[in-house]
Amino acid sequence: MKIGVIGGGSIGLLISAYLSDGHEVTIYVRRQEQKQVINEYGIRLAHQREPLSVSALLTEELAKEDCLFICVKQFQVANITPLFNKHQSPIIFLQNGMGHVDLLRDIQAQVFLGIVEHGARKINDHTVAHTGKGGIRIASYNGDRSLLEMMVSKWDRPDFPIELEDDWLSMLGKKLVVNAVINPLTALFGVPNGDIITNPYISTIALELCREAADVLGLDFSEQWNHVKEIASNTKENMSSMWKDIEEGRQTENEAISGYLLHHANHDIPFTQFAYNSIKALRLKKELMD
């Protein structure tokens, strides 16, 4: 298959690397420098010596693909949606949070939604470390289920599993709970994901964040708390994307995660409010220091 991956961050690089085995993968990036280095050196998984053959183009050079994986941050989706009606390839969105769902109505192509449970760390423009083995889950938003089944059968592999889900809303909700717990806490305390369960003081806060998120989304708390702990354990050495965004002075997905819960809550959720305000404060502090 001809697969396009939009986004040259850690997840975009990881997906491009694994799917390049048996498929023709093109990664679409924002910067000319990254395009050049990938075309020259390929993409390398940090635990492997040999680079993998992947082509790179700039995002505005989007060509016809058999399918597209959208791996940009939540707040970047709106900027690229006008490109999607050009070729109408089936599209798989892999964002944190749920705010991007409101942007999908005007897309004429078949749309699928997914979540990523892997840990990944971008080392440089063409190298990514696979820091936590998990999986990718995909459900249909308005796309043909049989088409999705066919595509997943071609992509799924033991070391990079891709699974089908029936209910996209429940799937995204469960991932939002995980993000609402792990992302702000790891960013605030500067710790890897595993500390969510190994540090008893952080774990106490994590439990309350999970309780609030599950309540807002109408999900079972005990089930979600077990899921959060499982993800934190599987990606225990990973530093969350929010921590990396804070460290590098980039915009975070705070609005799409904690902000989404605050907007949809019908009562006070104090732990989530604290997490939201704290990430805002941390980013402002970083900006002033820089």
What are the roles of these predicted feature ranges?
Residues 88, 127-137, 190-196, 238-248:
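Helix-loop-beta segment of a Rossmann-like dinucleotide-binding subdomain
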Residues 94-171:
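Rossmann-fold dinucleotide-binding core
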Residues 207, 211-290:
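NAD(P)-dependent Rossmann-like dehydrogenase/reductase catalytic/cofactor-binding core
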Residues 44-127:
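Rossmann-like NAD(P)(H) cofactor-binding subdomain of soluble oxidoreductases
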Residues 16-21, 57-63, 80-88, 101-108, ...:
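Alpha-helix C-terminal capping segments
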